[in-house]
């Protein structure tokens, strides 16, 4: 009797790990490299009202997330999740985010890489610098930069995002998808309204956020990011 019970117990112990493994496979765990994008810092811009530059800190990050998320080989952390974490942890509140702080944030959201950066708009001359940080080592993997006139702001964001994909060892987009991304041109005016919508949204000023999303869509009706943002904040 004891012999039969022992055999049954051994069988159960052997089967249990297998069952757990199958359940893990069934859950379809996402093994793609995670990428988190933090708000970009204004490095001392001139030529527009201060709120526009404050908004761009969020808008550039939002558009960078969108460009990176177009690559199906990456798992990009949602902007709202990053904003909530920054508020809860008071991380980076004292100024520029250090590689060590970026790595800490990356670990909290399960990312392999964190992207931070700065921008400066000097009366229409625009420059963007982005750093990709390895979360495990806190080391800066690469710094990517681009500069142009402010009216081509979206081109700068897209160019830098494309290079960052390569730095993160992601394969390039399929040709058809890449051509579609390249054919899209987001006017700087629409991007500015979108950025201000994010600023008001994060402040809890829903009515103003709705107004800015609508203004962005009035300038560029095909603005998918503004359409999605409006759906999130507009009262049902």
Predicted regions and their residues:
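Catalytic-center loop of serine/cysteine hydrolases
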Residues: 83-191
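Short beta-strand->alpha-helix linker/helix-N-cap micro-motif
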Residues: 27-99, 114-123, 141-142
